[in-house]
């Protein structure tokens, strides 16, 4: 019999809580990640007021320097810890895949100097559109459309760029390159980047609208991932007949593997929370696992190095956390975590190699406190333990610590 009938896992995309032990092996604009600290630096530089997460135990998580504006609770309502990544990567897919029990020992391919001519030529031949070569390099997603959007509006050329992550991104103005055409081109790009030396984690469609000087990316983003190389705990749950619900880009990240209810993409964090609440309220969702990604922290503020916006986004989530808690049933478990860091005060524009926080809450809890510091995959091991299925590759359950 399951200890919890339902588990709801919410990933606050990029909300790291301090540099990982191996952070100096990863860089941002040539600067090692060893001094990165997403929550710590936000708290220190612009202040952070998240009383509802603090109540569960956010301020109790062990750190060399406590969060400046998030106090420890003497009697928290839940359990807390931080988790370390073992996989060789700091991207979204690697983080989520490890959270679900995989160890990525060979990182996907990245292209610091842009994609090879062979790939660009193939995309041109398939699409009938030229590719803007000057954009073919690691680029900020907002800067690349500011720099090349006007040219695309004049010529219809494709904007193809990358980042420090193993991704190929295609930006297209919706009035110039229709969505169905953009998605079709991305599907082709996916088909030619499935093997080394160009094994990419994701192909991302990045549509935008507006006029030069005032471009805005839309919610019609699509991520085309590769399927996980080994079964995850999502697959184990699915095989056991236990319902799995995906909110936001989770279905894309796992390429649908192990997910039998895709609740759709998020237009915003707020929309994602609305969808989660709707999912939690489904009468037929009596037992199972929901998995939500809220990406605005990362996409809108982390990469853009906007500490004030990031803080406000955290405030907005915290203000809605009581709604999520109110939607829980007596034997539900809520887990709040992240997938990597993206320190908005740090060098560069890319993710940072950090610990991730873990907050656990249930109306059924009689106790509270700290869970031992562990690893990302401990989350999936705990989910597997609860529902009586096999774990994936790695992870140790902390289910017995939740009382």
Swiss-Prot record:
One biological process term in Gene Ontology: nucleotide metabolic process
Cofactor binding, per record: Binds 2 manganese ions.
Keyword Glycoprotein: no
Subcellular location: Cytoplasm
MF-aspect GO terms: magnesium ion binding; manganese ion binding; phosphopentomutase activity
Cofactor: Mn(2+)
Swiss-Prot/TrEMBL catalytic activity: 2-deoxy-alpha-D-ribose 1-phosphate = 2-deoxy-D-ribose 5-phosphate; alpha-D-ribose 1-phosphate = D-ribose 5-phosphate
Cited function: Isomerase that catalyzes the conversion of deoxy-ribose 1-phosphate (dRib-1-P) and ribose 1-phosphate (Rib-1-P) to deoxy-ribose 5-phosphate (dRib-5-P) and ribose 5-phosphate (Rib-5-P), respectively.
Family: Belongs to the phosphopentomutase family.
Name this protein carries in UniProt: Phosphopentomutase
Classification lineage: Bacteria, Bacillati, Bacillota, Bacilli, Lactobacillales
């Amino acid at each position: 019999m399951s200890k919890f009938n339902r588990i709801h896992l919410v990933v606050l995309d990029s909300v790291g809580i301090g540099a990982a032990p191996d952070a100096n092996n990863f860089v941002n604009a040539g600067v090692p990640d060893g001094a990165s600290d997403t929550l710590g630096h936000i708290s220190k530089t612009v202040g952070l007021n998240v009383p509802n997460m603090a109540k569960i135990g956010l301020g109790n998580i062990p750190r060399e320097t406590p969060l400046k504006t998030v106090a420890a609770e003497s009697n928290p309502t839940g359990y807390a810890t931080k988790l370390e990544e073992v996989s060789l990567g700091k991207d979204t897919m690697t983080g989520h895949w490890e959270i679900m029990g995989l160890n990525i020992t060979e990182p996907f391919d990245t292209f610091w100097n842009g994609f090879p001519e062979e790939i660009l030529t193939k995309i041109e031949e398939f699409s009938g559109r030229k590719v803007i070569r000057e954009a073919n390099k690691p680029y900020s997603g907002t800067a690349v459309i500011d720099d090349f959007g006007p040219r695309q509006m004049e010529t219809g050329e494709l904007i193809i760029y990358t980042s420090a992550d193993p991704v190929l991104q295609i930006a297209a103005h919706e009035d110039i390159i229709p969505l169905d055409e953009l998605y079709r081109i991305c599907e082709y790009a996916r088909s030619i980047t499935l093997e080394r030396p160009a094994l990419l984690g994701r192909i991302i469609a990045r549509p935008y609208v507006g006029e030069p000087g005032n471009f805005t990316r839309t919610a019609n983003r699509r991520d085309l991932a590769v399927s996980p190389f080994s079964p995850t705990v999502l697959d184990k749950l699915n095989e056991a007949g236990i319902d799995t619900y995906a909110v936001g880009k989770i279905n894309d990240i796992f390429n649908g593997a192990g997910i039998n209810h895709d609740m759709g993409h998020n237009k915003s964090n707020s929309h994602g929370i609305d969808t989660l609440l709707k999912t939690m309220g489904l009468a037929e969702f009596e037992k199972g696992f929901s998995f939500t990604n809220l990406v605005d922290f990362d996409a809108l503020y982390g990469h853009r190095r906007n500490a004030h916006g990031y803080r406000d986004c955290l405030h907005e989530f915290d203000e809605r956390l009581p709604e999520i808690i109110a939607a829980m049933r007596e034997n539900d478990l809520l887990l709040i975590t992240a997938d990597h860091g993206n320190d908005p005060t740090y060098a560069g524009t890319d993710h940072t190699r950090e610990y991730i926080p873990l907050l656990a809450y249930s109306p059924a809890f009689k106790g509270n406190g700290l869970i031992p510091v562990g690893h990302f995959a401990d989350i999936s091991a705990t989910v597997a333990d609860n529902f009586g299925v096999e774990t994936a590759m790695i992870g140790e359950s902390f289910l017995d610590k939740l009382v």
